[in-house]
A protein has these predicted regions:
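Non-catalytic connector elements of ABC transporters
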Residues: 1-69
């Protein structure tokens, strides 16, 4: 699959948490480095995401969001 985004990180899905409208996906791209993405439930179902599966975290500079816990 080709993508225009240059920041692509292959990794392993650690967790998939489905909410009312949004699914949060945690992808470990290196030991101890985890990206969390919020996607629609429909997208998560289409991608058939599951813990232990392989996925890419794709980051576009114009689409980076910042949050704190």
């Amino acid at each position: 699959m080709k993508r225009s985004a240059r920041n692509q990180f292959p990794g392993t899905i650690l967790d998939v948490h489905k909410g009312a409208t949004t699914t949060h996906v945690k992808i470990e791209v290196a030991p101890g480095i985890v990206f969390t993405a919020a996607i629609t439930n429909e997208a998560a179902e289409e991608l058939d995401l599951a813990k232990g599966g392989k996925a890419y975290a794709v980051v576009k500079a114009s689409d980076v969001m910042v949050g704190v816990e």
